[in-house]
Amino acid sequence: MAQDDSYEEKPEVISSDSGGSGYSTEIQIVGTVTSSDGSYVEYEIVHQKRSVWRRYSDFESLVKLMRRQYPAAIVPPIPGKQSLLSYAKHPRKAKSDAEFLNFRSRMLELFLRQCLLHPCIRSNPIFDKFIHSTVSWHVTLSSLDLPKDSNTDPLRLPPIATEHDPFAHLRSSMPLVMANSLSPPSSRALKPIHSLSNPSTASSLEPSSPLGSEDECHPPTSDMQPTHELNESPSTPTAPDFPHYNSSPSELSPTQRRSSISNGKDAPSPVLKDLTSYTQEVIVCRKFLHHSLSPSIHSTLSSISKMESCLSKLGSAFHSLTALNEIQLANHLQVIANAFEFSGMYAKEFEQEFNSSVYEKMVQSMQLAKCAADALKYKQLKIQQRDFLQDQLIHSNTMSATDSMVAASPTIHPATRLNTIQRAVVSQAKKGYTIFGRLQNVLHDFVEGETSISKESLQQHKNTIENQLAAANWDCQKIDEFMDAELKFYKECQTSQWEEIIKSVHECIYKWAQTNLQRWLRTREELENLSKDI
């Protein structure tokens, strides 16, 4: 491997503690090493006077692992992969481009600092091995007892996988829901446990999208413009006051929950209202950043790049005029040409600093906001999963009552008995359920040709729902216990990020204006001295 000396070591990061917890965020990426064949790059991480080397793919696996262990947490993002366009233009230099490696090093260092601020990740033993263990990351992962199934839906995972899960045996059968779209239970739900997960409903909270498709930016140059495909997931780089909410439904007794649902009120709970309101704020802010601020900054960078090119060409043009005039005038033209060339050089420096100090941090801020939106969405879906199970329990109780009524009237025909149960189920279906889900349930019952429902099946179904509802309530309670800390972490990260952005905007423009002013004041002085000699 060959050491890449083009990376300039940065000044020491200011140490800070999160709420006096003793976790220092003093961590750096001080260098990069490219493999001899150029196939990968390793980054040197220094923390607490210890140094380890990690590849970009190691960072990817760490993020995926943290998102699996903390589905309800705001896991900081890492920069995206090299764009296909830039790789197509420079296939052999993509891994060794100094400008791109510097950009990625800055963003990975920011990721590590945010992880050290995170209330859960900073004390995670796997993350500790990542920043301290000198053993290769592949070997470290092989030695850990991690679940092999990485495609499990997040709604079937505990909110915090690092703690004991008393409902682990129920996770695989937990129902999946979509945002604001649930299918009502039917008589087919009265089958064994595996049929509780309605195939017409699927969680819209899929595992995080591939990191290469996330918001990403690259240092813009004359032949490579920044590329960052910003999807429309809700996110925001602002730090508004976060509403405090508690899962009050989980604190009610089963009787109270059933009576509150059976009242027939369709108004959402205060918990869901708070989450919906905050998520809407996230969407509005992110749309402004995506459609207004980000394009404006990109346009500014492009204009600065064009200005640098024009100034350099203008300086060259003035240089060419020196051969066409007498010596005194040629000296004047030489001074002006030098001034224009220096202005072009200052514009190039201004473009690079503005990109690294402002644009890159803004994109990372949007990525972090997307992670926060995913955590809030997980919370919303957990509440909907719990409400869905509460509805199923009501339906099951209705069926039991109907079955008892029919048992007291033996003259009722079995087919009439089934229709009575079906009408009870349909009467509980509300407008929030999809037509497709109802139609699918009807077709399923028709094909199966069910004509009777045993009391044992009803009781087994009811017991299963009660156990799953207990698991959902436990999940919501766990999320509430650390959600305030998660939102506080998010607010601190975004506030710190935007304080740095505002400071960087001022410093970049002030430095550019000051150097240009000094250069042209010096040019005026030189021209005045030349004029005295004419």
Swiss-Prot record:
Keywords: Autophagy, Cytoplasm, Endosome, Lipid-binding, Membrane, Protein transport, Transport. The keyword Protein biosynthesis does not apply. Residues 203-212 have a biased composition (Low complexity). A 1,2-diacyl-sn-glycero-3-phospho-(1D-myo-inositol-3-phosphate) binds at residues 55, 57, 81, 104. Its main location: cytoplasm. It is a peripheral membrane protein. Belongs to the sorting nexin family. This is Autophagy-related protein 20. It comes from Schizosaccharomyces pombe (strain 972 / ATCC 24843) (Fission yeast). The gene is atg20.
